């Protein structure tokens, strides 16, 4: 019996698919499709790891989220006691400058739009987390791609010009029975952003890229949140539900600074507050509700911006299941 298909078949999209070889606590190897641990949200993207009904807005505006690429990773744990560190070193497919734009900086540069990824200029990632104090984790990450223009869909689209990208991030979390606190900062630098902008505005209308420019030289995001476990106030009485009232502040701007001759859009500068509740019905099941207010065009923590503010109320339900057993 002979069968043939005239139209293209479907495909399966995976966030992670890799093979891991555990060699020693201090050195292990992973190869395949994996998370790129740049920033707090990508490294800890499950919804029980942030209080809001949606992922932190700043990081997910300027960085891919969830950021996953194909490559190889070396990881392990060094030291012991108060001098315990986890590390990750990755070489992955680099970001594609075709996806860089005004409103999301490099967030849309993640590869995967087509069936093949370009590995002409790989991305190099280093992440280190300090875990020596119980309940405390302090981390930092660095991403470097020597030429994001080299990963363009068309090899000569950027006429041989280079566009190096550097992303720096730092984050921390402190968690005990009473309180959970998190903070993070991301700063990015794109060289030759003015030239990238001049080319991206001329991308084909048939492409799915936004073509909205200019792409900024620098982007930034920083945030902090604190939640209090109400059950702890009642001596951890099991009859009291596990509810965390929380507050979160974020500032982000995908157009923090441009090159000479570039005009940045003030509307991309956002200062925002989020307040709400998280009810953990189960350790891995959380019901969320929050209220958000965004001030547009200002970096001030308090006060209003020159544009109309945005206010919204959200409710969410999240369940995390990594493994299942009878």
Describe the role of every protein-language-model region.
Residues 84-87, 98-104, 141, 151-153:
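A short secondary-structure junction signal
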Residues 105-151:
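Loop-centered beta-sheet repeat module
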Residues 1-97, 120-125, 129-137, 218, ...:
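Outer membrane beta-barrel
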Residues 17-21, 42-44, 139-326:
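Outer-membrane beta-barrel pore domains
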Residues 48-56, 106-109, 200-205:
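Short glycine/proline- and charge-enriched loop/turn segments
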Residues 5, 48-49, 107-108, 114, ...:
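Short leucine-rich amphipathic alpha-helices used at interfaces
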Residues 59-61, 112-115, 212:
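Active-site rim elements
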Residues 65, 115-122, 160-164:
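Active-site glycine- and acidic-residue-rich loops that bind
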């Amino acid at each position: 019996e002979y069968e043939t298909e005239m139209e293209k078949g479907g495909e399966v999209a995976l966030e992670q698919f890799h093979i891991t070889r555990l060699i020693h606590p201090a050195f292990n190897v992973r190869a395949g499709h994996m998370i790129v641990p740049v920033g707090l949200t990508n490294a800890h993207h499950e919804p029980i790891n942030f209080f809001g009904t949606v992922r932190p807005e700043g990081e997910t505006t300027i960085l891919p989220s969830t950021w996953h690429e194909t490559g190889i990773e070396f990881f392990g744990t060094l030291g012991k006691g108060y001098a315990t560190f986890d590390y990750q070193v990755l070489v992955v497919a680099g970001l594609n400058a075709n996806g860089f734009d005004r409103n999301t900086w490099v967030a849309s540069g993640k590869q995967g739009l087509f069936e093949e990824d370009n590995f002409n200029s790989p991305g190099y990632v280093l992440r280190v987390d300090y875990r020596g104090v119980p309940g405390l984790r302090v981390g930092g990450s660095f991403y470097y791609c020597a030429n994001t223009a080299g990963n363009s869909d068309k090899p000569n689209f950027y006429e041989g010009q280079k566009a190096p990208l550097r992303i720096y991030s730092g984050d921390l979390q402190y968690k005990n029975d009473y309180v959970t606190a998190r903070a993070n900062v991301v700063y990015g630098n794109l060289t030759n952003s003015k030239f990238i902008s001049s080319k991206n505005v001329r991308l084909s209308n048939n492409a799915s890229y936004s073509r909205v420019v200019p792409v900024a030289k620098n982007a930034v995001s920083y945030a902090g949140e604190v939640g209090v476990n109400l059950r702890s106030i009642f001596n951890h009485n099991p009859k009291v539900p596990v509810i965390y009232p929380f507050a979160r502040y974020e500032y982000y701007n995908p157009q923090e600074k441009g090159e000479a001759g570039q005009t940045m859009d003030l509307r991309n500068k956002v200062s925002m507050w989020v307040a709400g509740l998280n009810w953990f019905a189960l350790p891995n099941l959380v019901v969320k509700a929050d209220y958000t207010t965004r001030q547009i065009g200002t970096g001030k923590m308090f006060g209003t911006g020159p544009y109309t503010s945005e206010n919204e109320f959200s409710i969410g339900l999240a369940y995390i299941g990594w493994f299942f057993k009878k």
